[in-house]
Amino acid sequence: MKIFSGSSNKPLAQNSAKELGIEVSPLEISVFPDGERRIRVVDNIVDEKTVVFQSTSTPPDQNYMELFFIADALKRSGASTVTAVIPYLGYERQDHVFRDGEAVSLEVIVKTLERVGVDKLVAFDLHSIKVPELFTIPVLHLSALDLFAQKIKELGLTENSVLVSPDMGGIRRIKMLSESLGNMPYATVEKNRDLETGDISDSSMKGDVNGKTAIIVDDMISTGRTIVAAERILLKNGAKNILVFATHAVFSANAPELLENLKAEKVFVTDTILVPKEKRFSKLEVISVSKTIAEGLKNF
């Protein structure tokens, strides 16, 4: 197996390769003055199984184009298979038409990945369990929930705590985590979002958090407004303490500032997306998924 990395998250590729006891193979990635990219495979990879890491977070278009070029270069260089490890799958929320006249952006991404030679895909905590159905190639859908359960146990939060989904779409995720924590109680926040602006107009809650530690769990944090709205409802309903867990640290706009100013004690994310120094804040703690990816690749 040969492992390669795009530009978006080299530390995750290196750590995952280390877990497998191998080195990341070199790639020449150069950028022309006009911004176009050129990819060149350096090593002989004829008949080799290859893996390429690339999170397609900000800037998603640039990261996807680089991934397409890498996959094409690997196949042209004789790789027997190309497995794309895309820990955060950009455009995954655009998986259907919300309003007339829209493109289904994720379908375009899927078709392109398959067309350029990707044979298998590894992703983490997809926004919808239906996303893998869009692919004709095998998809390994990994999750950070076991890592979250482990951290919750380490913090001694298995008693007098409630898992909270910040929206109705995360109920399945919360139920799975609840089961791994001995059927920990859970609550859900219902929110109404404007499809044009993305603004959350109002929220309500189902479940009891009064006097308890509320543990918000989501697949991603983008603008941070969903977490802010959820915290407001939880405090209103008597939550004693609040912690936040999310797989993907998208952190768009002023999300880091909003999260730092939460009443929540800690915000836990994973390294599916590389969080730059300017987006880090004192309440943030990053949990690595490198071992989970390495174990997944062994049998995929």
Name these PLM-found stretches.
Residues M1-F300:
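PRPP-associated nucleotide enzymes
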